[in-house]
Amino acid sequence: MKFMSQIEFYHNLYVSECWQKKKGKIVKRLKKKKLQPQVYVITLSQGEQNQLEFFSSVLLKQSIFEHSKLFVIGIADGYDEALFLVEEIVQDVYQETKSANARQFLLTDQAEYEKKGR
């Protein structure tokens, strides 16, 4: 029996501007691990010592992700757009907290959102 990775999405998901109208469809396809070569996912880093990482959604097909729990912060239209969104995320975090600790801010923000009942 194959286990699917557990993918959770940030309530205020960062999305490339060109994909705003397709966001729901892209998220649904990511949950089903459908191939979307142009989609890059921005996640909290698997190692807690790091903040964010991004990679092509095609990598979600690899067995290393079968038992992984991923918290997706953003979806981007390719590598360059992923770089841009990571910069935007860090700037937003710094503006809110005067710190670059994106991991802590995003997890706390998500927990508060879930506490309010979505």
Segments (PLM) and residue ranges:
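Short, solvent-exposed secondary-structure capping/transition elements
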Residues: 51-53, 81-85, 95-102
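Short aromatic-glycine-(Arg/Gly/Cys) micro-motifs in beta-strand/loop hairpins
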Residues: 4, 33-70
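A short, charged, amphipathic alpha-helix used as a generic interaction element across diverse proteins
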Residues: 67-72, 77-92
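Charge-dense polyanion-binding interfaces
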Residues: 93-118
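Hydrophobic alpha-helical segments, principally membrane-spanning helices and signal/leader peptides
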Residues: 28, 63-65, 107
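Negatively charged, low-complexity tracts enriched in Asp/Glu with abundant Ser/Thr
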Residues: 1-30
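Structural boundary micro-motifs
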Residues: 5-7, 67, 109-111
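Generic secondary-structure transition motif, activating predominantly at the C-termini of alpha-helices
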Residues: 31-34, 90-97
